[in-house]
Amino acid sequence: MEYFSNPSIINLFRQCTSLVSLPDISKWNISNVKDMSCIFDGSNSLISLPDISKWDISKVSNLSYLFSKCESLVSIPDISIWNTSNVKDMTGMFYECNSLIYLPDISKWNISNATDICYMFYECKSLISLPDISKWNTSNVRDMNNLFDGCKSLISLPNISKWDISKCKVEKKEKCFIIVLCY
């Protein structure tokens, strides 16, 4: 088992534009990692990911642009059991995953400490549906602009009318409630 003592594994496979697949990284011990931003960002030829569902991300505070621009990914491993309770930044996590049709059931993620979820599903053009994220605790989110912008294949959205948007930036309040621009 590979152990990462460094609290950051940012940009690990970033811009590996010719990379089609990865070796088995499922047994990596990342329990000490705090920053996972941009790990696969721009690896636009990746067609699949190894099973990363058992990664212990309980100390991670930054997941921004994690799968961003993985334009050839059709699905993401089942990351539904990830402990996201310490994550503050989820900006652009699935940004421009153009071929992604479905997401794992992320409805039970604890995002109560998240402050930024803007562009999370931005330009996921093939995404047909979303898990029921209506029960996400968004009380600390300050920026959720363009959350679903460009998700032109979405048939419906979960009922997010009860999300707490009281801490969203005032200058972005009109875009804060994110149902804008799903074309």
Where are these regions (language model features)?
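Negatively charged
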Residues: 1-183
